[in-house]
Amino acid sequence: MTTFIFFGKYTMEGLKGMSAERTEDAIDVIEKCGGQVKEMYAVLGPYDLLFVLSFPSTEDAMKCSVFLARMTGIAFTTAPAVSVELFDQMMSET
């Protein structure tokens, strides 16, 4: 499974539907797309949400990002991520 960071930015539409129930619905969508939730944060700064998720493929992560945006009205930017330990190992091999 590959780790992906989903950066979420609330839209006006997305702000209207905020609820614990919608969070549970989002987790269901993530799992239906083959994903696993590692962490979910509300943050301050250029983004409002930060999700750390795992997916079997990039295609699954992309599909989930679009499904979540349609369902919630939240704009997501999605990026693959590796641990610092793996990054250090990769750099030692170059």
Could you describe each region identified by the protein language model?
Residues M1-T94:
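A compositional/biophysical signature of low hydrophobicity enriched in polar/charged and small residues
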